[in-house]
Structures are given as C-alpha cells and as structure tokens.
Amino acid sequence: MSWDSYLDNLVAQSKDASGTAHVDRCCIIGLDGGAAWTTAGHACALKLQGQEGPNIAKCFKSKDFTAFMSGGVRAEGEKYQFLREEEGKTVLAKKKGNGAITLQASKTAIVLGHCPEGGQQGNTNKAVGVIADYLESLGM
C-alpha cells in the first residue's frame, strides 16, 4: 500500500480560502521505531535523516517530550525550537527563517507537516490533525 496519497491530501487540507497551501513538505512515520511510511521520492516529501525518525517516535511512544524541550525537534537536519505539546499527541516547533513543523500521533503513526516561513502554522496544524485523526479512526 502506498501512503503517498495521504501526503497529497495533507497538502490539500492545508489550503486557505485563496487556495494557498500552508504545508510544503510532509511525511508519515511509524510510532514503533520511526520508520518512514511514505516515500522520499514524493514531490512534497519531508525527508528525515539518520536517527530523526526513531528519536521522534521514541518521544511520542513514551509521551516524554523532555528531549524536544531541551534539544529541539530535529527534521531534515534542522533543529526546530520546541514550542509546546498538547495532550501527549501533538508537538509544535519553529525555526526562524525556516518555518514551523507540526507533529501529531495516531495509534500507530506520526504525521509530520512543515509550514514554510511566512505560512500559517494554524492551517498546518489543522491539516496534520485531519490526517492523524483519520488514521486513528481506522484504528491506525
């Protein structure tokens, strides 16, 4: 099964009334171990490097976000400043000049969406939430 259509849907869900998308890169990883579910070849793929996926998964699996609080959230080799976590399911982070990142867990996956600098992270949050909630509704 290809999960890449979920990335297209996530980008579409982030569009505002004018049709501007507020997600430029995204991916889905497994909650157990952080392995990529989506392919790096997708036009909007967020490409996690090295231990970034496993480290993100470890924090969400344990619901201990101390590593994010002290060392930031790392994605694509960039360090994003941790802003907050909500209900042990959602993490928001930002890097000046590079945009923001929203991460939300379902039962078995973590959905990540990147908002470009100048974009509306609120739209990114909504789009990531739609996909994560859909996966959750499927028991995933």
From Swiss-Prot:
This is Profilin. Occurs in many kinds of cells as a complex with monomeric actin in a 1:1 ratio. It comes from the Eukaryota. GO terms for molecular function: actin monomer binding. Coiled coil: none annotated. Binds to actin and affects the structure of the cytoskeleton. At high concentrations, profilin prevents the polymerization of actin, whereas it enhances it at low concentrations. By binding to PIP2, it inhibits the formation of IP3 and DG. Belongs to the profilin family. One of its GO terms (biological process) is regulation of cellular component organization. CDD domains: PROF. It comes from Suberites domuncula. GO terms for cellular component: cell cortex.
